[in-house]
């Protein structure tokens, strides 16, 4: 078995690695939005929530015509409670669920699982009252994650 050389590994800012978007006077990773249950129609697009079960999937719905309804593909979801999953398929995100998509490379299962383990270690330092929406995901230009 080849030994992994980690001598060049370093810290990175969330905003250096993942796609961000402007929000008010700051950058943040894309996030989902609250959609009333009455507006969701059964379909084939998974809806990701903060649950720790079934890869975060709460149900399957059709696309709806709303500025708040956003669909992402091939991404890592991170909820404000710290649940993290890889989604190689199209999915919509509920409120307080963030979308991590690499800036310059497509995710694959191996890269995603590696990044998930690194992110889980990093966010384990946050307490419930720090909820992730108020910490690294909401200020990705400042927060660093160390790969170790």
Q: Residue spans of the language-model regions?
A:
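A generic structural signal for short, non-catalytic loop/turn and secondary-structure boundary residues
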Residues: 7, 40-41, 69-71, 86, ...
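A short glycine-rich beta-alpha junction/loop motif
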Residues: 90-101, 129-148
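A short beta-sheet element
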Residues: 57-117
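A structural detector for beta-sheet-dominated domains
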Residues: 7, 15, 103, 146-148
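Short loop/beta submotifs within extracellular cysteine-rich repeat domains
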Residues: 55-56, 122-127
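Non-catalytic DNA-recognition/assembly elements of restriction-modification systems
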Residues: 1-55
